Structures are given as structure tokens and as C-alpha cells.
Amino acid sequence: MPSRVSPGIVNVTDFVAAHAKKFGSYINYIDREEAIRIDHFDQQNILSVDGYNHYMENPKKSSGIFTDQYDHLTPTQRVELKKQFTVAQKHQSVMWQSVFSFRNDFLAENNVYNPKTKQLDEAKLRDATRVAMNDFTGKMGMTHSAIWSAAIHRNTDNIHIHVAIVEPQPTREWKRVTVEGKHGETYQEWQRKGYVPKKILNHFKAAFANEMVDRDRSLARISDLIRQRLQPDQRSAWRHQSSLD
């Protein structure tokens, strides 16, 4: 049986309610130094495995937090971000977390990562994250209510982007859920809905991938296909038209 080839990019998304311990931990570490944040990553992360079913370990290196507006946050901006996440928790917002994971050869093929020099085009990954988040919040109806923060994490063998999303002024509907207590007892409480439809998740991943894939290489491939399908006399006309464009 032939071995299954894993995709070049995978995404896993989940959510927790406002009272979840890891929601509070994420907030507590927002304004801490990056070395401290990655040392305590497991206390903030709600995703046990990435899309390749690899255990989500503490990253060896992190780019630091970025957002929709800023590539790198100043200490003052970190404090402000922490305040917004705190308000979201106080108002019973859901916290979604999403991870994009990559195969290194896929990143190399798309000129995002150089395996020899270990250089990573973080700007391209940030741009792709912003495009994907714009798609996600739009389709979830949270364009004007959601805020998010993200960081690029690097381990020995893989690179991934970890994103956290909240609503300081929540718009999600309430639902009654059964919760298990500390001693195994169960009870019901009201929580905001955090479910994300599969169709939205598929668009989310596609938006990221489409932004990240090397456009020059894609355009070259399209041009090759056009040339292959045209008759010889049509090719010269097509080249002439292209030069005019």
C-alpha cells in the first residue's frame, strides 16, 4: 500500500469558555517576556496536537506576538492587548485558538523557508495570517467585534503559527451545556457558543494557503499551461498580446 503524503499545510481550531483555566493563563502571559511565554506555552495552549497529530510542545523559538495592525508589539501595546483580552473574559467571551502547521519542504517550495540557512520569511506568514483572520472573522460575523493575537513558533522539526481570538463585546449566542465539576459531578450552566462550521474552517485554511503560495511560481505554471494548449500560430499572438499588457 502506498504511503499517504501529508499535506503541506494543516489547520486545527478549537475553543474554550471564559472560565477555562487556560483562558486566564493566556491573558496572564500576554505582557511577559517572550522567553517566559514560550516556557509556559503548555499552560496557555488548548490544542493538544497539531494537524499532523504531533504533540504541541513548548516552542524552541518564537517571533513574539503580532496582531492585525502590528508586526511586533511594544510593552505598552502588550498591556493594552492584555486589557482587551481581560475585558473579553469578563464579558464571557469564548476564546478560540487556531494553529497552522507546515511541512518544511512545502515552505521551501514556496520561498518561505530556506532549509540551509534556516531563514524564515516571517513577513509572508504574518500577511497570510492576517488575510486568513479577515476571512474567518468575516464569515463568523465578527469583523467588528473580534480581536486576535498570534505568534510564529519554531521547534526543531516544524514551524507553526498559533492564533488566539476573543470578542471584548461578545456577539455569540448563549447555550446551556453540561459541565463536569472537580469531583466528577455534573451540572448545567450557560456558555456562549464557540462552534465553527467546517465550511468556514475550510475557507479559513484556503485563504491562508492562497495568500502564502508563491504567486510568481503560480503565474509561471498558468503561462505554461496556456502555451501548451494554444496552437503554434495562437502562441505568437498570445505572446504579442502579453507584451502589450
How would you describe each model-predicted region?
Residues 1-159, 163-245:
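N-terminal nicking endonuclease/strand-transfer module with a His-rich metal-binding environment
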